[in-house]
């Protein structure tokens, strides 16, 4: 993850944004659904979340190396007068611990003589509950937005909750914990309880982990009291200024609270 506010972080984010605008103007605009770090950073503000990843799910298209190569080539060929050039470097299947099978696209971007690597992970068949939403993505350097399809908030949170519950103390991605805290802080009042409940169960069903949900309370206890997890969180706090004031118990309280909310099925 890049350090928030650093030149590299801003440049990375800008290049991802340039790719998103090309998607929004391409024939594939209704097939690409944004998720992951770039979406969370957009939701909470770049000063509150670092990102190095652009994750998307694709619907209505095959996710294999050849088809994705054609799709990406078409997107980066969209003519935009922003001085940014994209070059495809490699496309490969994702095999590392992926919740969903997918394709990893590696590109380089060139802007004003500076070359920046850009990585995009593309999956298909994600459980989006109830469905993707139109997201108004604010541009960094211009006073306008682009409309793209994206995960809804409940599905973003459900995926992170499911990961925390099923990976227990083997989940070294502290950003999953931070994201739950910050998204709840900033957008918790907009959450639909029933949708969150349904999204968590749909995600677990898709990943074949439904049996783990019943163990959530024990998992949270184990994770909160784990010295390994506490050390990982302390390291994250030192690295990222936006998390510096957040104690581990505050983070875990947010995780427990979100899970409790998902457990309460609406009576409506």
Question: Which ranges hold each PLM region?
Answer:
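Residue-level preference for beta-strand/loop junctions
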Residues: 2, 50, 99-101
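Active-site nucleotide-donor binding segment shared across nucleotidyl transfer reactions
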Residues: 24-54, 58-60
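Short, mixed-charge aromatic SLiMs
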Residues: 39-45, 201-212
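Single conserved hydrophobic/aromatic residue that forms the stacking wall/gate
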Residues: 1-5, 9-10
